[in-house]
Amino acid sequence: MGGIVFNYIDPVAFNLGPLSVRWYGIIIAVGILLGYFVAQRALVKAGLHKDTLVDIIFYSALFGFIAARIYFVIFQWPYYAENPGEIIKIWHGGIAIHGGLIGGFIAGVIVCKVKNLNPFQIGDIVAPSIILAQGIGRWGNFMNHEAHGGPVSRAFLEQLHLPNFIIENMYINGQYYHPTFLYESIWDVAGFIILVNIRKHLKLGETFFLYLTWYSIGRFFIEGLRTDSLMLTSNIRVAQLVSILLILISISLIVYRRIKYNPPLYSKVGALPWPTRKVK
């Protein structure tokens, strides 16, 4: 059976004339949509207007996508410097989640400022949705046969008790590979379940920071298995370095805010405005 693929998945879902619609885009859209509905329930419980998230999600998704591409291009600049026409060809692949998080975060904070919303409250509301969307989105990598780990044997994959369609689609160019997409997807969904259940016990802003911490811990270890990492040097993977920084920053902010401000419990506040400094 080794080397025989019975259920190889075509990355293209269907064609509309000359346009190929890929499973990757469909799955990303599904992840965003499900995340929106999850966040919408939390939004209503918090006493915010039901349309509050529309602009936040639109601009965060738009600028997050752009930033994810820019981030990838920066760390692959030698290639794109010689092939500048490839920069806009996003359908050839090449986006980075950390870049998307940075762009989406900046856009979200700006929208909160314009709409007079509390960014800590909004961050807590959307954090579980973000990690859920990430967990779903990793299946887009599976459909594209990308973002996999290093070589393994078929026997190793069978020992994980994986469905055959996953094992067979991890056979790429004559070799089986670690299904790192699955490892991260499971980690992210577990994070979603945890965050949804502990959010009401956390102080304002902490759900978002714990999301960054949880995601970064998983990403750090899973990244070490991947073969397509963006590299800062020959030994330093960009995603692992960024993950360490996010863990340290997030934990530090949780501790600092508890000592300095002692914020209220997330579950004990209604709709909050943009935070202002009190003048004594």
Swiss-Prot record:
GO terms for biological process: lipoprotein biosynthetic process. Keywords: Cell membrane, Membrane, Transferase, Transmembrane, Transmembrane helix. It is found in: Cell membrane. Catalyzes the transfer of the diacylglyceryl group from phosphatidylglycerol to the sulfhydryl group of the N-terminal cysteine of a prolipoprotein, the first step in the formation of mature lipoproteins. It is a multi-pass membrane protein. A 1,2-diacyl-sn-glycero-3-phospho-(1'-sn-glycerol) binds at R138. GO terms for molecular function: phosphatidylglycerol-prolipoprotein diacylglyceryl transferase activity. It is an enzyme of class 2 (transferase). Pathway: Protein modification; lipoprotein biosynthesis (diacylglyceryl transfer). The chain crosses the membrane at residues 19-39, 56-76, 90-110, 204-224, 236-256. InterPro entries: Lgt (IPR001640). It comes from Staphylococcus aureus (strain MRSA252). Belongs to the Lgt family. GO terms for cellular component: plasma membrane. This is Phosphatidylglycerol--prolipoprotein diacylglyceryl transferase. It comes from the Bacteria. PROSITE patterns: LGT. Its EC number is 2.5.1.145. It holds the Pfam family LGT. HAMAP family: Lgt.
